[in-house]
Regions:
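Active-site glycine-rich loop that binds ribose-phosphate moieties when present
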Residues: 19
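Long, non-coiled-coil amphipathic alpha-helical linker/lever segments
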Residues: 27-57
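Short, small-residue-biased leader/transition segments that mark boundaries at the very start
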Residues: 1-6
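Amphipathic, well-ordered alpha-helical segments in soluble domains
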Residues: 8-15, 37, 41-44, 48, ...
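Long amphipathic all-alpha helical oligomerization modules
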Residues: 56-128
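Unusually extended, aromatic-enriched hydrophobic runs near protein termini
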Residues: 12-13, 32, 38, 118-128
Length: 128
């Protein structure tokens, strides 16, 4: 394994660490939309992986892959909107820096889910 794989924490842990060490005491409402997309993406990955065991006979595996990709696109849009909201409404530079990190890592969670879906799709295509 390359060095980065061995020492990289998972994406959700990255979000939690930012909340912890930046001592974030209250949650911005716009972050909840990103969190909701992350949860849906993780749930969809779980469903996809259950179907993956029988991918040759699965009727829903492809739908799960498409749903994960769609959720990642939604997260990209919410990320841009949230960052814009943060930078136009917040006047505290420290708060801006802290929340930029949180938003960034929340979006990376959906990127990671999409990566899993991409790998599953590649495996299915190679073995079909």
């Amino acid at each position: 394994f390359p060095y980065t794989t061995l020492f990289r924490s998972d994406k959700i842990e990255d979000v939690m660490l930012r909340l912890y060490y930046n001592n974030i005491q209250s949650i911005r409402p716009d972050s909840l939309e990103l969190v909701s997309i992350v949860v849906k993406s993780c749930d969809m990955v779980k469903l996809m992986l259950k179907e993956f065991a029988s991918f040759r006979h699965s009727k829903s595996l492809r739908d799960h892959i498409i749903a994960i990709n769609t959720l990642e696109e939604q997260a990209d849009q919410v990320f841009v909107t949230s960052m814009r909201e943060l930078h136009t409404t917040c006047t505290d530079p420290v708060e801006i820096i802290c929340w930029r990190e949180v938003y960034f890592y929340l979006e990376k969670c959906t990127d990671a889910c999409e990566h899993v879906a991409d790998v599953v799709e590649q495996i299915v295509m190679k073995n079909s």
